[in-house]
Amino acid sequence: MIRYEKGRCRVLAKLLRPKTTVSAHCDLPCGVYDPAQARIEAESVKAIIEKYHANEDPVFRARAIGIKEQRSNLVKEHLWVLWTDYFKPPHFEKYPQLNQLFNEATKLAGAAGTKQSLDVKVAEDLLSKISEIDKIFWETKQA
């Protein structure tokens, strides 16, 4: 049986409490960001949709849909990292359309977009939004 004494618990809590609190903008602040990751996944989504329409095999089509949904999720994840970790308040001040672009792009990669749709036009719209984000991203890197 363990006996707790007030003084000893306070001492133990004090010993275990971190001495310094640190924070970072991401899980591992590597500083490597590039919209190309989202673009490559979005290009993959578009290619999968095109291949889906060109193939009548139901097994192939089922696999294509599963892979397309995974790739659509990866597009969203890469966009979210850029949106929440790379871009800072000064970027949003200089580019007021940036939040709207990210919102539209992540929706195009989500359930209302390429994740659920088999429309090549939706994938092209997603690539267009990523291209706009890419342009702004590289402008901020030059600054």
What are these regions (language model features)?
Residues 2-61, 91, 96-132, 136, ...:
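N-terminal intrinsically disordered, cationic/polar leader segments
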Residues 61-79:
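Alpha-helical segments in soluble extracytoplasmic regions
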Residues 75-77, 82, 110, 140:
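A ubiquitous, low-specificity "background" feature that marks scattered single residues
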Residues 78-95:
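Short, solvent-exposed, charged loop/turn and helix-capping segments
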